[in-house]
């Protein structure tokens, strides 16, 4: 958790939970964020920061989806490798978080969606308290066993688009077995965000491991 001394108008005892959402291009990061926000807001006070290299496309899509009120979504143009802005030099995102918390000092969760990146991407502990890493079945059955920090070290690993398995020749049982082997006891979810299948497990994880952790 983070120091809240600078949040002079915050009335809640605990600092906001910072949740990093990472994964390759097209895996479903923005859709995941949309679905989670729609399910948890306004019961929980949420803000979201999206990262794109040259545009603010994810901010636009998230806003159009109605996931949150527009003023609660901020787009960041990283202008370089996506992982740099969430790991080596997270300053652009830290500034964005501070900016949003000035407007919404009682936020329960700050979501930070990274730009699409490779399996080596990971969030700086300074930026994220919990990390969600998402891949999609259409990228290939072999992805879980390729490893990488997103797969092996994320707090929750999400395999999306399970409905596409028959069309791309992917065996979900193999993907699940490989995931268990690579992650050990760390949790993962097989889901289809298009239908909402598996979303409840993601939300339960955020509540039990983040918001309501003893």
Curated annotation (Swiss-Prot):
Position of the signal peptide? none
Q: Which UniProt keywords apply?
A: Chaperone, Cytoplasm, GTP-binding, Nickel insertion, Nucleotide-binding
UniProt key word Chaperone: yes
Q: Where do the annotations place GTP binding?
A: 23-30
Q: Which GO terms describe its cellular component?
A: cytoplasm
| Major place of residence | cytoplasm
**Molecular function terms, GO-annotated:** GTP binding; GTPase activity; nickel cation binding
Q: What highest taxon heads this organism's lineage?
A: Bacteria
* InterPro entries cross-referenced by the UniProt entry: CobW/HypB/UreG_nucleotide-bd, P-loop_NTPase, UreG
Tell me the GO BP annotations in alphabetical order: urea catabolic process
The places in or outside the cell where this protein is found are: Cytoplasm
Q: Subunit arrangement? A: Homodimer. UreD, UreF and UreG form a complex that acts as a GTP-hydrolysis-dependent molecular chaperone, activating the urease apoprotein by helping to assemble the nickel containing metallocenter of UreC. The UreE protein probably delivers the nickel.
Say what the protein does: Facilitates the functional incorporation of the urease nickel metallocenter. This process requires GTP hydrolysis, probably effectuated by UreG.
Q: Which PANTHER family match?
A: UREASE ACCESSORY PROTEIN G (PTHR31715:SF0)
**Can you tell me which family this protein belongs to?**
Belongs to the SIMIBI class G3E GTPase family. UreG subfamily.
Q: What is this protein called?
A: Urease accessory protein UreG
Q: Which organism is it from?
A: Bordetella pertussis (strain Tohama I / ATCC BAA-589 / NCTC 13251)
């Amino acid at each position: 958790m983070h120091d809240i001394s600078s949040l002079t108008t915050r009335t809640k005892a605990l600092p906001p939970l910072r949740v990093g959402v990472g994964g390759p291009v097209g895996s479903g990061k923005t859709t995941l964020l949309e679905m989670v926000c729609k399910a948890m807001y306004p019961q929980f006070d949420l803000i979201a920061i999206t990262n794109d290299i040259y545009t603010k496309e994810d901010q636009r899509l998230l806003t159009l989806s109605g996931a949150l009120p527009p003023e609660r979504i901020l787009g960041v143009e990283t202008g370089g490798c996506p992982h740099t802005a969430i790991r080596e030099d997270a300053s652009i995102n830290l500034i964005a978080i501070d900016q949003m918390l000035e407007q919404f000092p009682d936020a329960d969760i700050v979501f930070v969606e990274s730009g699409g990146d490779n399996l080596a991407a990971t969030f700086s502990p300074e930026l994220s308290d919990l990390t969600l890493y998402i891949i999609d079945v259409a990228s290939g059955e072999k992805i879980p066993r390729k490893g990488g920090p997103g797969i092996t070290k994320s707090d929750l690993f999400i395999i999306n688009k399970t409905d596409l398995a028959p069309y791309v020749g992917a065996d979900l049982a193999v993907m699940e077995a490989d995931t268990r082997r690579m992650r050990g006891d760390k949790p993962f979810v097989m889901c289809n965000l298009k239908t909402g299948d598996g979303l409840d497990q993601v939300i339960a994880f955020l509540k039990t491991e983040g918001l309501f952790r003893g």
